[in-house]
Amino acid sequence: MKLIKHICLQLILCLLALIAQQSIFAQAYNAEAFLPPPSGPYKIGTKEIYLTDSSRHEKYSWSKKYRKMSVKIWYPSDYTPELGYDCYMATYSTKIIFDIFKPLGVKKSFLDSTRHFKTHSVCNAPLSTKQDKFPVIIFSSGYYFGIPDLNSCIMENLASNGYIVCSLTHPYEQPYVAFPDGKKIYLKKGRTRLAFLQLLIADWVRPKDKSTVEKREAITRNTLKRLKKFDKALKLWVDDSEFFVKTLIDNCAKNDTFFCKIDTSRIGALGHSFGGAVAGQLCKNDPRVKAGINIDCFQFGNVIDNPLTSPFMLIESSTYIDWNIGNEIIYSKSNADFYKLSILNSSHFIFSDASVIPFSNPKNVTDFNGKANGRKTINATNNFVLHFFDYYLNHDSKSKKLLEDKFSNSEMIFDYKLKQ
């Protein structure tokens, strides 16, 4: 009898141990990155820097203080895994993210759960010593919704392939930025929403007849004239970006231990949503920026009358058909190599981490990504972004060959027009 009790006790203990072990494995799995594994040979480090432009006063402040900004940087590293990976969205409270994305039906409890996931990056890991210099990409995310970490998929992939990627935060017109002195700047919701109101009015009064190129161009020009709020924001963000380019060059000249590793002869511009329009205008304004990519934004600004002279790529969703038509008019005037990747049946946020975030509600997947496959889309986006910059910044002949293959299928269309 005692033997039977002993055996039963051992079985119970084994069962409890197995359950505990499964629980530990589950917790470990939940802490793993949902972000796709970066494709490059480098490990990834992150750091944040804070800058003040003493040549410009802050337009959103009555106190005439100088314009301040923060920059999150992803970069190639040779760290060891023991350093521990960054948590996803670690510097943003759930409340801030929820307040911005609540209209899209995302639950606060779900946002809380994403914070247990890890990225593939390590905060303040040492910069890689495997190259003397690395090319740099200047990135901006979206107006109103823009959070640098929400584009970690693209940032990490570029950094793992030897790029230093600098994501600028534009205070007052993006959700949140905190400075080392304790100052916190939040989105000016009322003022920023006026830009969207102008957009709604422009859509409402837009002529419906788009039957000819001339009519489509007239519609595009009329839309650009009506979007004054976005034009003002574009100038502010481009000024931020040009100030950052100057900062990079100045710090390189001072032999800063981090910035002296940046090759300022190989600068690219990249942006998602409104940041994509910033990339286009920055390429036009600043000859130090050698190539750029607009991910899913209408090209605000004066590019329509001042065609691009730098290689450029447009990656577009199916969300804003009129924007796509307008971009076709604007970029058709380009005086440099131009590429376009169209993702069919997709929504605007499919180019962000929303493409792979493990949403618990299937409706969220459709709202953010459309009907397109999120993981396949972000992988394709990463592939084209990388090959584009590899060719135009690193002069890699293999990437050139990959960019020469036009294709069209039920999911994507890739086309280009090369300068003769």
Give, region by region, the residue ranges found by the protein language model:
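Bacterial Sec-dependent N-terminal signal peptides
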Residues: M1-A28
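Domain-level recognition of soluble alpha/beta enzyme cores
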Residues: Q27-I137, G370-K371
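Alpha/beta-hydrolase-fold serine-hydrolase catalytic core, especially in secreted/extracellular enzymes
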Residues: A28-P36, P41, G45-T46, S54-S55, ...
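Short, solvent-exposed beta-strand-terminating loops
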Residues: D78-I96, Y172-V177, Y339-P358
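Short substrate-entry loop that stabilizes the transition state in hydrolases
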Residues: H120-F134, F139-A178, Y320-D322
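Alpha/beta-hydrolase active-site loop
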Residues: F179-K261
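Primarily recognizes the serine-hydrolase "nucleophile elbow" in alpha/beta-hydrolase
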Residues: F243-P307
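The feature captures the conserved acid-bearing segment of alpha/beta-hydrolase catalytic domains
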Residues: K290-F351
